[in-house]
């Protein structure tokens, strides 16, 4: 029991002395950004002011100048006179010429169809990509991956978003589209928070089993980015993280929660990697008026 407690403490709290994040990156390292961007909140051009949430998100992405970016809750429209395309900005303006967008829901019934899912953007060529479906008929999320050619070193990057718990976004008066949660609307509308936690924990456990199975099969050194919707003390995190390096544990300080609501200590977003790779610095700034998640920026040594 004592050992179990220590395990949770060291997974939850970073014990490294605070260090200033070095903007200059060494040549044998890649800079990675992982972020649940919350659909960019609003892509309507009439709301795209200099301090709009979407603009704050894109400005931070630009400032980081990462080599590889993994996004959860990513969405994009086709560019038109009313709506901005997030993909177009990342490719044409920021020059991320290689990307793989795993579309989980195309939202084809909307007046202007919006594609939603997870995405990987890279300055390095993508030589292979694919995805594995979680077994939920009405909520078709995936574990996606892209194999990158990083200076002749093949590295596989995985990215995923585990099932949202709907703890506060879906109340009875919400005007959201419920079509994608048909299999568990009873829990969403009528379940108390504790019931939701129990239900979605069981969902996450099944998703974690598929993730760990695929990570164990990886033929290459890999990086795993995710919004786990589970904290480090959970079975889900402990199962996935087993035998892997955690960028936060290697370089993080304090609690460093990644979710801005409910509790400042909730570290539900992670960057993990196989033992051939190591994080050399970690940064998760509190970006205001942006996503409800905080970004993770880390430098990873490629041997």
Where would I find each of the regions flagged by the language model?
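Acidic/histidine-rich helix-loop elements
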Residues: 34-53, 75-79, 166-200
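Extracytoplasmic/periplasmic, Sec-exported soluble proteins
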Residues: 49, 53, 66, 82, ...
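Beta-strand-turn-beta hairpins that frame and shape the catalytic cleft
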Residues: 23-33, 123-128, 139-183, 276-277, ...
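Metal-dependent phosphoester-hydrolase catalytic domains
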Residues: 1-12, 131, 202-223, 228-303
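A short, flexible N-terminal coil/short beta segment enriched in small residues
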Residues: 1-22, 167-170
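Short, solvent-exposed loop/turn segments at secondary-structure junctions
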Residues: 37-40, 76, 106, 124-127, ...
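Membrane-embedded segments
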Residues: 14-146
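Active-site beta-strand/loop signature of hydrolases that rely on acidic residues for catalysis
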Residues: 31-37, 56-83, 121, 146, ...
